[in-house]
Regions:
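Glycoside hydrolase catalytic-domain groove-lining segments
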Residues: 1-16, 39
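Aromatic-rich peripheral "rim/lid" segments of glycoside hydrolase catalytic domains that contact
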Residues: 20-101
Length: 101
């Protein structure tokens, strides 16, 4: 589509909020990689945020819809991981090499 001049937008990607530090590290890795992939190929994207607080299935609260504040320190860390992936000096390979073990 893109090569033919057709605009592409990727919405509603995400990874549910996680309950422990190891799971949160993998969530941040996924979001960071996906955001960098999106930027690398010029496809605008947005994270899915349904406002459901907590951890587990269908829990995608990142930004409080009423106040505009982060929902939690973990949500802020996830969003910050995505923001850092937009830097021009960071490559997909860099993100991949720094995946949680």
């Amino acid at each position: 589509f893109i090569s033919k001049g057709v605009p592409v937008y990727l919405g509603e990607f995400g990874c549910v909020n996680r309950g422990n530090a190891r799971e949160q590290a993998f969530q941040q890795y996924y979001l960071k990689y996906f955001a960098k992939l999106s930027k690398t190929y010029g496809v605008p994207s947005i994270i899915w945020d349904n406002g459901a607080h907590g951890a587990g299935n269908e829990r995608h609260a990142f930004i409080d819809h009423g106040t505009g504040e982060y929902c939690s320190a973990e949500a802020k860390a996830a969003i910050q991981a995505m923001i850092t992936s937009y830097g021009n000096s960071l490559t997909l390979e860099d993100v991949y090499r720094n995946a949680p073990k």
